[in-house]
Amino acid sequence: MKYLDRIADKMLRLRLEAFGAVQIVGPKWCGKTTTAMQQSKSLIKMQDPDKREGYLATARTKPSLLLKGETPRLIDEWQVAPVLWDAVRNTVDERNQKGQFILTGSTVVEDKNGEIMHTGTGRISKMPMYPMSLYESKESTGSISLRLLFDDPAYDIDGLQSDMTVEKLIFAACRGGWPASLDVTSQEAQLLIAQDYVNVICDEDISRVDGVRRQPALARLIMRSYARNICTLVKKSKMLADITVEMEKTSMPTFDDYVSALQRLFVIEDVEAWCPAIRSAAAIRSGAKRCFVDPSIAVAALGMSPRSLELDLRTFGFIFECMCIRDLKVYSQALGGRVSYYHDRYDLEADIVLHLADGRYALIECKLGSREIEDGAKHLLQLRDLIREKNKTEHQMPLREPDLLIVMTGGEMAYTREDGVKVIPLATLKD
């Protein structure tokens, strides 16, 4: 398969220039190892079945031997031997050179045995990686740059068009951003990747992540409940009640344990609330918005197909929002981006608040169809006006006004409304 350029490529190059080592973290199958291999000069795969035991024996006795090789040296699935973390850190200190190692792994390491003595602060830079955005999978036209939207107030987007119909967006969400799915000819086979991903997570990885035996059936129920409530503010107690209909003895601590394991596997990645001081704390919703790292996980967990989603556009609206969140995380990485949401008791909301490292931010609503654009724009303008009203009385620490108001759509044409709200099809965006 020909390597498709990733937005992470540039991020990795910059981090290798700045740090002695880079740790790439993210869900399995999202392309971490393949991306790292484009810039590494030597490689060791810790999970190679023919060499694993020998590698582990070496790690126990003299881990520095595993670090010998041309640099940058890629250590794939390093968490198999957590002691390698300190070995990398010490070697970086001794060599005092940049770009020595790349570490990849698909789990957050729980160091129960005390094998990691030090953090990697200043030596090992952590770089998140996600499944492919629509631009990386060559489906977004990339005619609208997220960076330019922030940097250039006069940036003209009017008339720029997406090549993706709603049907194509639905298929892309069902297939997901898994690189392996793009190396398959038939659409039926492409859809199997996400389905198999969910099976592997539930049957194997959820127990393997920390060595605690967990029930695949319960893992499936929890993922299905999450999928039913994707991009909503549903409480854990409601999801637990949903699950106990089929598994009566499931407790909240058990539910929390499974969700925590799925978070360590980078499967679940909830969206936190944005709570600016524009209303009383009690008026602003502060619970997490339920989200997967890729929309295809929700589709597979629900057992849905492109056809069933075409007949249920209400459900696809939530899955579309998950796809918007994934792509915005990818596109905003170089800008230090992070996402949150806003929702208050008066039903004033912004589906996504995209924050940049320098303090700039965008309020974003995700609306699949053109009929919903007016409603989305209305919410954004009301929220901006609320911030302005608050600033009239808050002179010491005024809240920054949003730099952008955007309605992300599944439509085909981009334009700027007279009120300044930008209407942007998801499949026109790039970084």
Each language-model region and where it sits:
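Accessory nucleic acid-recognition modules appended to NTPase machines
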Residues: 182-360
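Conserved catalytic/switch belt of AAA+ P-loop NTPases
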Residues: 85-109
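Conserved lysine of the Walker
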Residues: 32-33
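Interdomain motor-coupling "hinge/lid" segment immediately C-terminal to the ATP-binding subdomain
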Residues: 115-228, 232
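Domain-level recognition of nuclease-like catalytic cores that cleave nucleotide substrates
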Residues: 406-431
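Short glycine-rich substrate-engagement loop in P-loop NTPases that contacts/grips substrate
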Residues: 43-72
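Hydrophobic anchor at the beta1->P-loop junction of P-loop NTPases
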Residues: 24
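N-terminal pre-Walker A segment at the start of P-loop NTPase domains
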Residues: 1-13
